[in-house]
């Protein structure tokens, strides 16, 4: 039930381990910080990490006449979250499903969740271009998807896989809003200087290759990692950090792009 959702954004990456779920959660929190009502849908069925990242493990979802009721992070219901992680008894329980069952679950997430009125729905996806992605794109064609944010790290091995994701978006007709380069440089926890421990500017070159906007470059910041397991936004806890600056600019760019 996405008829009350104004903007649907899919967060993608062809490579695992690039911090896509962290980007999704912190982007959702940043949008909430800016006064928007936000939904976060985690469709990584085999590796759901959003409940852990937001400290919501152990919370239950319920059914009402209108469908599943998502988990809310606060009493004001400004951030709604849905994940298969809420349906598992233990975090260690594996989801061993074949494609058709995964497809059915994702369709349920997209059609049977009572999101109410949302300014943004952020959909965090698993890496790759598998059944899950095809199902999401097919379902979103019926209700409309406003675009995809693609997350990469600067290393060439990640860029190769992310190029495939760009091709996937073009073939399925999904508009690419832009590319976020994550884990670019390491922020010293003592002096906060940033050192490039890997290659750099991979996201910039990828954006140039795909002819899409470069939405920002996020470093590895141990102070941000400490926020895992909470609903605290980087914008609140570390307002002067590079991560907060990039997320602030990202929110402004999204507002501009989706308003036009």
Curated annotation (Swiss-Prot):
Keyword tags: 4Fe-4S, ATP-binding, Cytoplasm, Iron, Iron-sulfur, Metal-binding, Nucleotide-binding
Binding sites annotated in the UniProt record for ATP: 14-21
Cellular localisation: Cytoplasm
SUPFAM superfamilies per UniProt: P-loop containing nucleoside triphosphate hydrolases
Molecular function terms from GO: 4 iron, 4 sulfur cluster binding; ATP binding; ATP-dependent FeS chaperone activity; metal ion binding
Cofactor section: [4Fe-4S] cluster
Main location: cytoplasm
Signal peptide: none
Co-factor binding comment: Binds 4 [4Fe-4S] clusters per heterotetramer. Contains two stable clusters in the N-termini of Nubp1 and two labile, bridging clusters between subunits of the Nubp1-Nubp2 heterotetramer.
GO annotation, cellular component aspect: cytosol
InterPro entries linked: Mrp-like_CS, Mrp/NBP35_ATP-bd, NUBP2/Cfd1_eukaryotes, P-loop_NTPase, YlxH/NBP35
HAMAP family: Mrp_NBP35 (MF_02040), NUBP2 (MF_03039)
Assembly and binders: Heterotetramer of 2 Nubp1 and 2 Nubp2 chains.
PANTHER family in UniProt: CYTOSOLIC FE-S CLUSTER ASSEMBLY FACTOR NUBP2, NUCLEOTIDE-BINDING PROTEIN NBP35 YEAST -RELATED
Record's protein name: Cytosolic Fe-S cluster assembly factor Nubp2 homolog
Species of origin: Drosophila simulans
């Amino acid at each position: 039930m996405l008829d009350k959702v104004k903007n649907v954004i899919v967060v993608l990456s062809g490579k695992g381990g690039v911090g896509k779920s962290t980007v999704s959660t912190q982007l959702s929190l940043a949008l909430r910080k800016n006064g928007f009502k936000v939904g976060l849908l985690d469709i990584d069925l085999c590796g759901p990490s959003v409940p852990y990242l937001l400290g919501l493990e152990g919370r239950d979802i319920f059914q009402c006449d209108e469908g599943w009721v998502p988990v809310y992070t606060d009493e004001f219901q400004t951030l709604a979250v849905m994940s298969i992680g809420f349906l598992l008894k233990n975090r260690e329980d594996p989801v061993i499903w074949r494609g058709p069952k995964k497809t059915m679950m994702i369709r349920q997430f997209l059609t049977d969740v009572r999101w109410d009125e949302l300014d943004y729905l952020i959909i965090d996806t698993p890496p790759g271009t598998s059944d899950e992605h095809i199902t999401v794109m097919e379902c979103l064609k019926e209700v409309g998807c406003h675009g995809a944010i693609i997350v990469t790290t600067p290393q060439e091995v990640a860029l190769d896989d992310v190029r495939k994701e760009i091709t996937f978006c073009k073939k399925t007709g999904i508009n690419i809003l832009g590319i976020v380069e994550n884990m670019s440089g390491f922020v010293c926890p003592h002096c906060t200087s940033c050192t490039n421990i890997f290659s750099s500017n991979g996201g910039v070159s990828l954006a140039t290759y795909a002819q899409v906007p470069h939405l920002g470059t996020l470093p590895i910041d141990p102070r941000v990692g400490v926020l895992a397991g909470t609903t605290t936004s980087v914008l609140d806890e570390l307002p002067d950090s590079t991560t907060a600056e990039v997320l602030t600019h990202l929110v402004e760019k999204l507002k501009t792009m989706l308003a036009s």
